[in-house]
Design a protein with these regions (language model features):
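Histidine-centered, transition-metal-coordinating active-site segments
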Residues: 11-130, 144-148, 154-453
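Short polybasic linear motifs
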Residues: 1-2
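Short active-site segment of divalent metal-dependent hydrolases/proteases
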Residues: 137, 141-142
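Elongated alpha-helical scaffolds
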Residues: 130, 135-136
Length: 453
């Protein structure tokens, strides 16, 4: 009996030791995994990579994580999405992509952190990689010809950005190597709800890296001069403060110049009527193709890439498979479709035979709008696809008002005394522009209609 108890006791000791060894092994493995992630998060390339850039001269990449993200298929897809959509039909140089812009935003944030914020007690440099990743990936979910596409198919590029960050993607795999919660943290920064508002402000505010890059980049590629401002000065006077990024008061005039540049770019480039006309034609192409599909029309060139969007059941992989090159290929084939509306609209878009426009708000002048509809019908065209009301508006600067949440965080100045003041309180120029929303109403119609508008 004593012998059996001894054997039983020895067996228990063995099992306990085995269990402890297993737990210890798992703990060591987990610790090693954490070390590997820490090593990856701080890993530097053996040799710095640089991208030659017409706006910033060079884009510098030293972090392994950033380099790995750039090489993912989801980020490379941005090469095939134009930054300015249909604007290339007006300004022939505007062929730059969201890939270009995303690298530019990353470079501005890198410079702010490494050259200005680093070493300052108000800045937590452990947030550096997070800010760089959010800057690089902020436009990841944009689709082809974003705005027209979203209007017809009710997609949301912000939702797709989040889906790419958190889904079964190459980007997610890279981010997870930094930490299990790292993809979610990047998504929170881009969604503007991350706890550290300093990081959010770098990516999304009224003077963020996104705006500073696209204003200069779009001005460069369109060939205009009014999108330029003194970014070097602005970066030098940016300072991290509690829950915000502020501008030293000595840099106020550079900020005024930046806001004026943005105002002019919206009026002259982003709201250009010919670009909006092209977007109207594009909108009607997609709307007509969707309608034909719903009616069971047999396409000569079957729109397999569009089918999920027609039904509203789009998988992430299907969304990522559609880019502007593919869309243009469909439009070229559809020029020979049997449906005369679809073929004509595609011909107009491909050959830049766009709609004319008149200044008209249909709600204020319903009789004039009804008359235009009748003119379109009189030449044998369907107003549903050949008339497009459109309105554009922009707020140059959204200042702070008690009880009102601004669309973007206001710009704050740090006075020599250390006091923080909102920009519109100090700048007469910005105060005059603030909350001044200009809305421009137009209606687009075929060139075949001749009359004085």
């Amino acid at each position: 009996m004593r012998h059996h108890f001894a054997l039983f006791g020895a067996k228990c000791v063995f099992l306990i030791n085995a269990k402890l060894a297993f737990l210890s092994y798992n703990r060591i493995n987990n610790d090693l995994e954490e070390v590997r992630k820490m090593d990856y998060a701080t890993a530097k390339l053996a040799e710095e990579k640089v991208f030659k850039d017409p706006v910033h001269r060079y884009v510098h990449v030293r972090d392994q994580v950033i380099w790995d993200l750039i090489k993912t298929r989801e980020f490379q897809r941005l090469r095939r999405i134009r930054q300015l959509g249909t604007t290339y039909l007006v300004f022939h140089g505007a062929e730059h992509s969201r890939f270009n812009h995303s690298l530019g935003v990353y470079e501005i944030v890198r410079r702010i952190i490494d050259d200005v914020f680093s070493g300052r007690p108000e800045w937590d440099n452990s947030e550096r990689l997070l800010a760089l990743c959010a800057a690089l990936l902020h436009d990841l979910g944009h689709g082809p010809f974003s705005h027209a596409f979203e209007a017809v198919f009710a997609t949301d590029h912000e939702e797709y950005t989040r889906a790419i960050l958190l889904g079964d993607t190459e980007v997610n795999a890279v981010l997870r190597k930094v930490g299990k919660d790292f993809p979610e943290r990047v998504a929170q920064v881009i969604d503007n709800n991350y706890t550290n508002q300093q990081v959010v402000s770098l990516i999304s505010s009224q003077i963020d890296a996104d705006r500073m890059d696209y204003l200069q980049r779009d001005a460069y590629y369109t060939g205009v001069s009014y999108g330029h401002f003194d970014m070097e000065r602005i970066l030098r006077v940016m300072r991290p403060r509690k829950d915000m990024v502020v501008i030293k008061a000595s840099g106020m005039h550079a900020i005024e110049d930046y806001i004026m540049s943005r105002y002019q770019m919206y009026l002259q480039i982003y709201f250009h009527p010919v670009s909006r006309s092209a977007e109207a034609v594009l909108n009607h192409i997609l709307k007509r193709a969707k309608k034909l599909s719903e009616e069971g029309y047999q396409f000569k060139f079957e729109p397999v890439h569009f089918t999920p969007f027609f039904s509203g059941e789009v998988l992430l992989e299907q969304y990522l498979a559609l880019d502007e090159n593919i869309m243009m290929t469909y439009f070229q084939f559809w020029m020979d479709e049997g449906d005369l509306i679809l073929s004509d609209l595609c011909r107009r878009f491909i050959n830049r035979d766009l709609f004319e426009h008149m200044d008209l708000n249909p709600e204020e002048e319903p009789e004039r709008y009804a008359w235009l509809i009748e003119q379109v019908k009189a030449i044998g065209l369907d107003p549903e696809y050949y008339v497009k009301p459109d309105s554009t508006s922009d707020l140059p600067y959204d200042f702070y008002r008690p009880g009102v949440v601004p669309t973007k965080r206001p710009i704050y100045l740090e006075m020599p005394s250390g006091e923080i003041r909102e920009l519109a309180e100090q700048s007469h120029i910005v105060s005059a522009m603030a909350n001044n929303i200009k809305t421009d109403y137009k209606v687009y119609y075929p060139k075949e209609i001749h009359f004085s508008s």
